[in-house]
Amino acid sequence: MARDLIFEIGTEEIPARFMNPALEQMAAVASQLLQEYRLPCQKVATYGTPRRLALYLTALAENQEELVQEIKGPPVKAAFTADGQPTKAALGFARSMGVAVEELVTREYNGGQYVFAIKREQGRPAVTVLPELLLAVVNALSFPKPMRWGSLEIRFARPIRWLLALFGSEVIPVELAGLTASNQTYGHRFLAPGPHQVPTASAYFQVLEENYVLVDQHRRRQLIWEQITGLASREGGRVEKDPELLEEITYLVEYPTALAGHFDPEYLKLPQEVVITPMRDHQRYFPVWNAQGELLPRFITVHNGTADHLENISRGNERVLAARLADAAFFYQEDRQTPLAAKVPKLEEIVFQESLGTMLAKTRRLQRLAVNLVNTLDLPAELVPLVERTAELAKADLVTAMVYEFPELQGIMGSYYAAHDGERAEVCQGIRQHYWPRFAGDRLPDSLTGMVVGLADRLDTLVGCFGAGLIPTGSQDPYALRRQATGVVTIAVEFNLKFSLTASIAAAYEGYTAGGIQLARPLDVVQEQLVQFCRQRLEHLLEEKGYRYDVIQACLAAGSDDLAAAYHRTRDLSAFREEEGFAALQTAFTRAFNLARQAREKYHLRPEALQEKAEAELYRALMETRHQAEPRLRAGDYLAALKAMAALRGPIDAFFDNVLVMAPDMEVRNNRLALLQAIVNLVFQIADFSRLVP
């Protein structure tokens, strides 16, 4: 027999960003505990609103499954005499296991015969196990910022106010936070607070819906989207898909009702982002667009309640937005009273990081490093004054009133203000785009100024923080250095930038020294740690793109200082693996790698001392392969280089078939090892083949 179970944790309003991770964690923990407690069920599901986390188990068994354990005892020879009589060993083992000696069985184990005791533990009724199991579920949940309340020791996302636990119609008396679970829940805080009795687990959803709570977040999300899109259409426009905002609103309301509002069309004269940011990021409103992609003076929001009095609610939302837009219009007007360039000296008032100076000092470092990168990347010389100016103005909007009020607009407002001041289009684009990509999967800069200054900005931050010892540990990354490093890797890979990460780290480090800032850690330590840090980000990027782990490791073992080259070597080796005959070639190269590594030192190859026909032919093949492969390696065409190297397979096989590498004569041996080392050095420019899995 089986029954459904509902377990609800009622709380004060939990922040929306906590909800999805908590529900996923709750489902995973419950599934694991059900296995450990031997309680099978048909389905594990979790639901949530701002005021509750709910676990629903469909068709949960009424009893634990029987536990059967087979415990190994002494060998049969030691347990029984030749005529089958139990020895003291068998009797003692049976007694210790609590079974009769006649119940011992024989099993084969590691090639021998042993006696085993079979112990059976009857399953307990689920109702006796569930209080412990459900309490364990709650205790396993973790939140970014848990809190305590009253004199209780428990920590949770927000104070727990009630518990409901029903197994069918039977209450499970879970005790937690000074509360005991009952069959009562609470409805919408204002429309039907309750308490409300839930007769059975399966009635839970209906009882809540009757009391203005849609507990199923998936249904709530779908309903919100249908209401929003329908309302936008009736308003003569459309809303764009915004999964993040939709997700947030889903966990801000229990009984959603969408409503429309309007604002003064005069505000449409402001930059689009200035209108949208207060609307979306601060008020959680959806902007409305016309068919031509133009912003309309309308918005749609979601009310936590019924459709009663929507007109009054809409007017209230309009007043709030009008005040924010009026502030934004004022800031926009005031900020443009002085040129953006005139604001740069004020960056001296903003601390970048306590031990790394001010934002003005960072600006000067960016100018220096951006110019260095133009030269390093072999970009056109006419780009130098453009990136220098972009770097000078990139952070200037941090001192504007608009960005102070709306930090999300940094870079965006600088771009608008620079355009107002008559700066070059390339500079305006660079100011806006140097923050791109802001996160994994975000858009990339499409201007060289944005790409170069963005790369310089990230390198400066990474080098400064690593130099100051501010390295991420575990989940702690207060300066978002993982995101910064991912940005460096992504830009290098997507723009196919050819540069030495080690050298660029040195250039960034020198910027601190030149500015009078002595970093706590020496350059060589920063280089070693930061190259490894970026390598990990590259490895993660490659794994996300679906490349095999062994291919990634083989290519990164051959070097990751040139990030783009390491990426493209992985891509091309992955493609080459699919070619016919690759397995045999891999075997040949791996044999060469393994033998060459047995050498205690690097040997000088003397072609004239090659004695056997097979080794002489291998040398000639190596010279021809070098001639074919090296231009392709320099050009970054690693697939073509690999195809050229494939010509070595036959000569390598013949060499190993006919030549004794470890010859008694040390000069002959060392020369043959030198030949293999030369092959390895060529192939190692792409990958360490010995790391590939057949």
Swiss-Prot record:
Under the heading Pfam families, the entry gives:
DALR_1 (PF05746), tRNA_synt_2f (PF02092)
Alphabetically sorted, this entry's keywords are:
Aminoacyl-tRNA synthetase, ATP-binding, Cytoplasm, Ligase, Nucleotide-binding, Protein biosynthesis
**What InterPro entries is this protein classified in?**
DALR_anticod-bd, Gly-tRNA-synth_bsu, Gly-tRNA-synth_heterodimer
- Subunit description: Tetramer of two alpha and two beta subunits.
Question: Which GO terms fall under biological process for this protein?
Answer: arginyl-tRNA aminoacylation; glycyl-tRNA aminoacylation
Task: Please state what the protein is called.
Answer: Glycine--tRNA ligase beta subunit
Q: Name one GO molecular function term.
A: arginine-tRNA ligase activity
The record's EC number reads 6.1.1.14
The family assignment reads: Belongs to the class-II aminoacyl-tRNA synthetase family.
Say which enzyme class the record assigns.
ligase
Reactions this protein catalyses: tRNA(Gly) + glycine + ATP = glycyl-tRNA(Gly) + AMP + diphosphate
Q: Where in the cell is it found?
A: Cytoplasm
Q: What organism is listed for this UniProt entry?
A: Moorella thermoacetica (strain ATCC 39073 / JCM 9320)
Q: Which HAMAP family match?
A: Gly_tRNA_synth_beta (MF_00255)
| UniProt GO cellular component terms | cytosol
